[in-house]
A protein has these predicted regions:
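Intrinsically disordered, low-complexity segments enriched in small/polar residues
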Residues: 1-63
């Protein structure tokens, strides 16, 4: 199970806020959704047993 996670690297011209500013248990961002594009970002998770892992998913959006 994941205890906390961090989001970083969202495009600051499209997403507000563009990251979680450290480890959190919840995160919300607002997407302007004014560009048809695919955006990359990084998720870093801390598991309950202390292990860390990361993933680089993508968000695809557009008008």
């Amino acid at each position: 199970n994941v205890a906390s996670f961090a989001i970083s690297g969202l495009d600051p011209t499209e997403f507000t806020p563009s990251g979680s500013n450290g480890q959190v248990t919840t995160f919300t961002t607002t997407d302007k959704n004014d560009n048809s594009n695919t955006y990359s970002y990084t998720v870093t998770a801390v598991h309950e047993d202390g292990r860390t892992s990361s993933h680089d998913p993508k968000i695809e959006n557009g008008t």
